Amino acid sequence: AVGLHLSGVLTAAEAFKGFVDSNVILFIAMFIIGAAFFETGVAVDVGNVVNKFAKNETILIIAIMMLTGIMSGFLSNTGTAAVMIPVVIGICKKGGFNQTKFLMPIVFAAAMGGNISMIGSPGNMIANSNLQEAGLGSFSFFAYGEVGLPMLIVGTLFYAFIGKRF
């Protein structure tokens, strides 16, 4: 942005417009919250609770995917996956499960869960910002959830009972 401004391609307002966009600030804040979740030990506590109830592979897949998906609805998809990977590896080691079977479900659930709320996925925020700039209104915070939550539930059940075989 600085180079484009100094070379005269963009005005200062155009070059730095993205840095003051509320979506950019919100996106940065989500990464901070995700890091705090891990640093405070909440991630480990969640892993211990999941480990207590997950007695077989199918239940563990459902628990991991639902937890990841719900977290992803309110935090960054990438940040959620990054936080959940070490948690799931720890759960698998503690429970004697093969960790390679549980890493892809994290990514799937984070992607699906991102559609629960406005802040779950950067694409949701960008679409909303574009609607507002065009003067077409905006989505409510949970507008995406009408499709996103059922998609997370159905996707989780599909993966737990059918998809894990492939």
Each predicted region: which residue ranges?
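Small-residue-enriched core segments of transmembrane alpha-helices in multipass membrane transport
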Residues: 1-6, 87, 149
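Alpha-helical transmembrane segments of multipass membrane proteins
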Residues: 2-6, 69-70, 111, 134
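Juxtamembrane and boundary regions of transmembrane helices in multi-pass small-molecule transporters
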Residues: 94-166
